[in-house]
Amino acid sequence: MKLITNKQGLVGNITVPGDKSMSHRSIMFGAIAEGKTVIRHFLRADDCLGTIKAFKALGVKIEETDEEIIVHGTGFDGLKQADGPLDIGNSGTTIRLMMGILAGRDFDTVILGDESIAKRPMNRVMLPLQEMGAKMHGKDGSEFAPITILGKQSLKRVEYHMPVASAQVKSAIIFAALQADGETIIHEKEKTRDHTEHMIRQFGGEIEMDGLTIRVKGGQKFIGQEMTVPGDVSSAAFFIVAGLIMPNSEIELTHVGLNPTRTGIFDVVEQMGGSLVVKDSSRSTGKLAGTVVVKSSELKGTEIGGDIIPRLIDEIPVIALLATQAEGTTIIKDAAELKVKETNRIDAVATELNKMGADITPTEDGLIIRGKTPLHAANVTSYGDHRIGMMLQIAALLVEDGDVELDRAEAVSVSYPTFFEDIRSLLK
């Protein structure tokens, strides 16, 4: 696909799609709650539609209208054995959280996905669930999908110290803990996104959060809710960076989720001297949301590492692009988790942006980016990774000497089906 290039400014207003993490979880909680859950501003992208498909296969009645998703939940015990394997496509969130949900059911399930899912590590989820009494295994006894979950297991409480900072692993343990005897205690390595914890409370459940320690009791019942999903800050990030690096630009992003566990990119933009203002913030069904305004800015390099990394892990590809347009060196470290995303994002970012003229050195746990560098025409690939694909389109906007051809552009639909349309709507 030929990308949009050689543009002199982006001006206008965008409402980014619903938050991907929250859209997944809204379906999951709606399914295990009792009664009707109505979800507005749901992300109708491949990953989240895959979660709907999976729960329909498990016997949950889900209606889809133009404005709403309506889930008719009948509790954990209302889930039924699927007729065949659950195919969750490209969604790591779906497979890992479903492992926790299905660990305590009284039927067997096989979960599989695409070629990317088949390469992603699942021991990080299987090991704590097995400690709780779950029985599951990967293909040929490995840790890789397809994952077979054996039903009719009694789950027991566990006190678990997480070896990696992962909201997906934490959430899988929480879903299993809701079906276990007693109180499960989870100690996080670093604070990660806490949508699952907040949604437990939103759906009428109880959970204790004290710093990095989480306590959750089994046997809880949930009640269906009405909710509006805020805009996804990870999707907004592409327009935040575009507005900062494109000359003569000012972009307003409305109804963006402002959960502090997700807004690390705001802190980085401030460190780099970028113009970013948050206004009109309000609580949307328990979640903070607001309008984010960005303008063209002169940027300087910075160092990014430590406990901020889980707050911006999905934004690092586009933050790396931002750093190519900053004066000086930017160092990103403590981000080895990027190697086990949809692709090895450390290598993918360095390889593809360097093709375009950037000066980036990949490291074991991050990137060293030397700026400021002009970007040039090139043939690039997304590797089938939606965030790499969208980052490369933002990079292409700066190119003045020819075309940028993106291979596997269709990956963008995983999280942002209208991305290219929204870019065009901002062109002067």
Swiss-Prot record:
Record's keyword annotation contains Oxidoreductase: no
Protein family according to the UniProt entry: Belongs to the EPSP synthase family.
Pathway: Metabolic intermediate biosynthesis; chorismate biosynthesis; chorismate from D-erythrose 4-phosphate and phosphoenolpyruvate: step 6/7
GO function term, MF aspect, one: 3-phosphoshikimate 1-carboxyvinyltransferase activity
Source organism: Listeria welshimeri serovar 6b (strain ATCC 35897 / DSM 20650 / CCUG 15529 / CIP 8149 / NCTC 11857 / SLCC 5334 / V8)
PANTHER family: AROM/DEHYDROQUINATE SYNTHASE (PTHR21090), PENTAFUNCTIONAL AROM POLYPEPTIDE (PTHR21090:SF5)
Lineage: Bacteria, Bacillati, Bacillota, Bacilli, Bacillales
Places the protein is found: Cytoplasm
Catalysis: reaction(s): 3-phosphoshikimate + phosphoenolpyruvate = 5-O-(1-carboxyvinyl)-3-phosphoshikimate + phosphate
Binding site for phosphoenolpyruvate: 20, 92, 120, 168, 345, 387
GTP-binding found in the keyword field: no
CC terms in the record's Gene Ontology section: cytoplasm
Keywords from the UniProt entry: Amino-acid biosynthesis, Aromatic amino acid biosynthesis, Cytoplasm, Transferase
Assembly behavior: Monomer.
Job description of the protein: Catalyzes the transfer of the enolpyruvyl moiety of phosphoenolpyruvate (PEP) to the 5-hydroxyl of shikimate-3-phosphate (S3P) to produce enolpyruvyl shikimate-3-phosphate and inorganic phosphate.
Record's protein name: 3-phosphoshikimate 1-carboxyvinyltransferase
